[in-house]
From Swiss-Prot:
Protein name: Peptide YY-like
Family in the record: Belongs to the NPY family.
GO cellular component: extracellular region
Cell compartments where the protein resides: Secreted
Transmembrane segments: none
Subcellular location, principal: secreted
Coiled-coil region: none
Organism: Gallus gallus (Chicken)
Alphabetical UniProt keywords: Amidation, Hormone, Secreted
Pfam families: Hormone_3
Alphabetical list of SMART domains matching this protein: PAH
CDD domains found in the cross-reference section: PAH
Length: 37
């Protein structure tokens, strides 16, 4: 029932891709923790 976890951009990712990944990851964590409580 959890949303899919964002994929890690990998070692060759650009700074923009990494920033996008971290914002997606933060959003994902918010969704997961909100569902639990």
């Amino acid at each position: 029932a959890y949303p899919p976890k964002p994929e890690s951009p990998g070692d060759a990712a650009s700074p923009e891709e990494i920033a996008q990944y971290f914002s997606a990851l933060r959003h994902y964590i918010n969704l997961v923790t909100r569902q639990r409580y």
